[in-house]
Amino acid sequence: MTTIVSVRRKGHVVIGGDGQATLGNTVMKGNVRKVRRLYNDKVIAGFAGGTADAFTLFELFERKLEVHQGHLVKAAVELAKDWRTDRMLRRLEALLAVANESDSLIITGNGDVIQPENDLIAIGSGGPYAQSAARALLENTELGAREIVEKALGIAGDICIYTNQFHTIEELTSKAKDPENV
């Protein structure tokens, strides 16, 4: 249970997440780092789901990035294949949001690798709130990617009981894909 949101805008891609870890109905920790830099700081990734499961997936994904020389899409597809077919990995319950300078992806345990519309990702229990907020800000303001992520996480944290106001945010310079990103 968490909120991870990613926005790509005006030459930047940002992934941010809250820091709350819960066990049942109890907050166990409030400062978990659910967003990390991978592959020599060229990839940023965030997770929603079980913490131990997510750390396992981070390690596996980083290995795939090494094998595929940092090619994000290939590494994501290979991780998703393994995740879906390996008996032990299938039990892992988490979602990953990953991005590099040119691509943003969601990787699921069902074997899905999804490139979202408008390079907006929001996953976890607070994902729908963060996505709604980020989309409104993207469509109606000139705010930068980082500010949109900060505001979307704040709104999700105000609404979702499994999301707090401790945020970890990572940012990369992005390659432009459309006029909005120039």
Curated annotation (Swiss-Prot):
Its EC number is 3.4.25.2. A double ring-shaped homohexamer of HslV is capped on each side by a ring-shaped HslU homohexamer. The assembly of the HslU/HslV complex is dependent on binding of ATP. The lineage of its organism: Bacteria, Pseudomonadati, Pseudomonadota, Gammaproteobacteria, Enterobacterales. Keywords: Allosteric enzyme, Cytoplasm, Hydrolase, Metal-binding, Protease, Sodium, Stress response, Threonine protease. Allosterically activated by HslU binding. Its main location: cytoplasm. Belongs to the peptidase T1B family. HslV subfamily. GO terms for cellular component: HslUV protease complex; proteasome core complex. This is ATP-dependent protease subunit HslV. CDD domains: protease_HslV (cd01913). Protease subunit of a proteasome-like degradation complex believed to be a general protein degrading machinery. SUPFAM superfamilies: N-terminal nucleophile aminohydrolases (Ntn hydrolases) (SSF56235). The gene is hslV.
